[in-house]
């Protein structure tokens, strides 16, 4: 009798409710980042970003460039960008590839699979024992970009992610490292991105990580 393939439900971070931390740029090589795509290097122009994540699919980023503060809030498919003198609201329901999710930070949470992603088991990685899944968007969202992810089945965090565009071309590989555990959740504290020349384009480290601290939903109001 054949063994049943692992399901994404087996490795979701069900204990995750929210997280807050500071993301600090360690490496941001604009030449190598530009090989990923023309816009990818923009986030590496910030020395630090204060990040808040909350289920289901809420994100807040606060940063500063010189004397200018910038806030980005995502609540479901709605995005709000605020800088002094400008507030811009967008509905990204038809542009799911532009939405940031817990996946960007190495987490796979239940809300990602409600009206956004579909997961297909690929294999067990022989070298690491990680489960490998392909994540695609629901067909109704009309976006054929995808992610191939490696998940540690015990600690339930993403160790590696390959990013493919809508033409099926791989753009980059992300490595999620140095996980720390808090309140039953393993959370990576270092992210390295390599381009398709296998050159390190960016490195980000997370400090002051607080898991399930009870972040107010008011922080994510749009």
Positions of predicted regions on the chain:
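Generic beta-strand structural signal
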Residues: 53-54, 73-75, 124-126, 151-153, ...
């Amino acid at each position: 009798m054949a063994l049943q393939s692992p399901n994404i439900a087996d490795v979701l971070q069900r204990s995750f409710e929210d997280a807050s931390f500071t993301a600090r740029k360690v490496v941001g090589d604009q030449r190598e980042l530009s090989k990923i795509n023309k816009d990818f290097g923009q986030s590496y122009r910030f020395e630090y970003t204060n990040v808040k994540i909350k289920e289901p699919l809420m994100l807040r980023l606060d940063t500063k460039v010189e004397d200018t503060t910038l806030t980005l809030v995502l609540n479901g498919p709605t995005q709000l960008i605020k800088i002094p003198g400008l507030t811009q609201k967008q509905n990204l329901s038809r542009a799911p590839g532009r939405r940031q999710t817990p996946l960007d930070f190495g987490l796979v949470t239940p809300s990602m699979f409600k009206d956004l992603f579909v997961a297909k088991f690929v294999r067990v990685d022989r070298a690491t024992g990680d489960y490998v899944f392909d994540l695609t968007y629901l067909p109704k969202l009309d976006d054929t970009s995808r992610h191939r992810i490696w998940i540690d089945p015990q600690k339930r965090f993403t160790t590696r992610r390959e990013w493919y565009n809508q033409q099926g071309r791989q753009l980059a590989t992300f490595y999620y490292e140095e996980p720390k555990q808090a309140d039953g959740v393993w959370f990576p504290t270092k992210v390295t991105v390599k381009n398709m020349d296998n050159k390190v384009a960016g490195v980000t480290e997370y400090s002051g990580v607080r898991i399930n601290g009870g972040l107010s939903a008011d922080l994510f109001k749009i």
